[in-house]
UniProtKB/Swiss-Prot annotation:
Region (ZP-N): 221-314
Domain named ZP: residues: 221-477
Domain notes: Each ZP domain consists of an N-terminal (ZP-N) and C-terminal (ZP-C) region connected by a flexible linker; the linker allows the ZP domain to wrap around the ZP-C subdomain of the preceding subunit.
Chain intervals for the UniProt region annotation (External hydrophobic patch (EHP)): 484-492
Name of the protein in its database record: Pancreatic secretory granule membrane major glycoprotein GP2
GO biological process, one term: neutrophil migration
Gene: Gp2
Disulfide links within the chain: 41-52, 56-150, 78-168, 100-138, 106-173, 131-139, 183-193, 187-202, 204-234, 222-313, 254-277, 394-454, 415-470, 459-466
GO molecular function: antigen binding
Keywords attached to this entry: Cell membrane, Cytoplasmic vesicle, Disulfide bond, EGF-like domain, Endosome, Glycoprotein, GPI-anchor, Immunity, Innate immunity, Lipoprotein, Membrane, Receptor, Secreted, Signal
GPI-anchor amidated asparagine: lipidated positions: 505
Source organism: Rattus norvegicus (Rat)
Domain EGF-like positions: 179-223
Length: 530
């Protein structure tokens, strides 16, 4: 027994027993060698022979991620200077690898690994061989090391007594799978953080068992053209679903499989179109709400296991949705064929206010006196990202004949009639929608009705200037040549008599526009005024 220094071992009652190693481990198949040494003491016969210490408390920390076996950067780094007790920490790993490491890893030429298993708590200091891989020999060089398992505040760790390296460039490696768990995002309760494919990531727990389908709450991405429904892949696995999940919407013809998404989610999509795939569209006055049900099955043949997930997306009410949800909107539609670009559908409707979300309904529009009429048109089929809707000419006639010689132009040659201060063109030639408003009127003479007609043009924004530039000279241009095959017609619009306030056919649902009608009209003058 070696004498113990009183300053070091008073509390331990000098119960130290040293068993010096007598076995040299060759190759990389050595068995566990437990020496039951807890403290490291100076070499016998040296001046420090009586000085002993616990390497768990006295060591040098090495925090160097480049030691990771996943580091393939070649370098001449060498550990010939490392002598003493060391602890590996950091993202590169906290333990030496226990299997052969490929050459040119760990930021060196010949990487060193631990031949044998690591000790566990209570084993004390054990002897191992560190091997360096080179020249197709996993233990071309070797060096004796000592290892001890320690217990700290953060858990178990290991310390290593290194004796430099037999040659350069050799370096001690670390196993990145032993690095502290460091997933970039917090794992959900149904996940666990593991080292996989050379990085830390959240994966589904293998022991997950889910019985409550209510926990399967979808994440929704309410896009402009489609609704993406995302479900937790881990929870689906806990319910018994495998990789291939068959999906159905309300319309059983809309079926497919879930697609993988990042972070253990799977998804499917539904179009944002009324009635498509069984979509149910509701209008609550301020929002358009699309509802559907996603059904999940494990196979195309269903016997006893089907999960239904209800979902809905709410959108701000717009012109298109308001027309889809109106019972009997007053609209006019036209199919326009653009060579090489397909067929487009243009729709025009009359609206009650500047929100363009409350269309007039019925067979005709019966207006209060001096009401402002709001006219909206939109492309609802075709490539709206490329083509913009442009109203080239909009005019009123006292008859339903779009070629009536009596015309009052509201928009002429793409520009508003600036002699009529009530005309306001809010949008034209800049998107898939066009909007304008005008204070309504009646033609003088024996005319009780007003009809609106608009010539439309689909402007290719990639080759044309679509937004009108309205100069004074252009406003005074000659009579436009109108392509009657591209004209939308809407009407009739008639004056609502003050003496007949109960008339409801075609009136807006929200009344309260009681102004004064113009009292002087001259049809011929109006026809040539602009």
């Amino acid at each position: 027994m070696v004498a113990c220094d009183l300053l070091w071992l008073a509390a331990a009652s000098c119960l130290l027993t040293l068993v010096f190693p007598s076995t040299t481990h060759q190759g990389y198949g050595n068995p566990r060698n437990t020496s039951n040494v807890d403290l490291d003491c100076g070499a016998p016969g040296s001046s420090s022979a009586g000085i002993c210490f616990d390497p768990c408390q006295n060591h040098t920390v090495l925090n160097d991620p480049s030691r990771s076996t996943e580091n393939t950067v070649s370098s001449e780094e060498c550990d010939s200077h490392l002598r003493g007790w060391y602890r590996f920490v950091g993202d590169g790993g906290v333990k030496m690898p226990e299997t052969c490491v490929n050459v040119y890893r760990c930021h060196t030429y010949a990487p060193m690994w631990l031949s044998g298993s690591h000790p566990i708590l209570g084993d004390g200091i054990v002897n191992r061989t560190a091997c360096a891989n080179w020249n197709e020999n996993c233990c071309f060089w070797s060096s004796e090391v000592q290892v001890k398992a320690c217990l700290g505040e953060s858990g178990e760790y290991h310390v290593y007594k290194l004796q430099g390296t037999p040659e350069c460039s050799l370096r001690y490696c670390t196993d990145p799978s032993t690095a502290p768990k460091k997933c970039e995002i917090a794992c959900r309760p149904e996940e666990e953080c593991v080292f996989q494919n050379n990085s830390w990531t959240c994966v589904c727990r293998q022991d997950l068992n889910v019985s409550d389908t209510l926990s399967l709450q979808p994440l929704l991405d309410c896009g402009a053209n489609e609704i993406k429904v995302k479900l937790d892949k881990c929870l689906l696995g806990g319910l018994g679903f495998k990789e291939d999940i068959i999906t159905y919407l309300n319309d059983r013809n809309c079926r497919g499989t879930m697609k993988d998404e990042p972070n253990n989610w799977v998804s499917t999509t539904s179009p944002v179109v009324a009635n498509d795939c069984g979509n149910i569209l509701e209008n609550n006055g301020t929002q358009a709400i699309y509802r559907n049900t996603l059904s999940l099955a494990t196979d195309f043949i269903i016997r006893d296991f089907l999960v239904n997930v209800n979902f809905q997306c709410a959108y701000p009410l717009d012109m298109n949705v308001s027309l889809q949800t109106a019972l009997q909107p007053i609209v006019s539609s036209l199919n326009v064929d653009v060579g090489g670009a397909g067929e487009f559908t243009v729709t025009m409707a009359l609206f009650q206010d500047q929100s363009y979300t409350h269309p007039y309904e019925g067979s005709k529009v019966l207006l209060p006196v001096e009401n402002i009429l709001y006219v909206g048109a939109l492309l609802n089929r075709g490539d709206t990202s490329r083509f913009k809707l442009l109203l080239t000419n909009c005019y009123a006639t006292p008859s339903g004949d779009r070629n009536d010689i009596v015309k009052y132009f509201i928009i002429r040659n793409r520009c508003p009639n600036q002699r009529d201060s009530t005309i306001n063109v809010e949008e034209n030639g800049v998107s898939s929608e066009s909007r304008f408003s005008v204070q309504m009127f009646m033609f003088a003479g024996n005319y009780d009705l007003v009809f609106l007609h608009c010539e439309v043009y689909l402007c290719d924004s990639t080759t044309e200037q679509c937004q009108p530039s309205c100069s004074t000279s252009r406003l005074r241009s000659s009579e436009p040549a109108i392509d009657l095959t591209r004209v939308l017609d809407i009407g009739p619009i008639t004056k609502k008599s003050v003496q007949n306030p109960d008339t409801s056919n075609g009136t807006p649902r929200n009344t309260g526009f009681l102004l004064a009608w113009p009292t002087f009209f001259l049809p011929v003058f109006l026809a040539w005024l602009f």
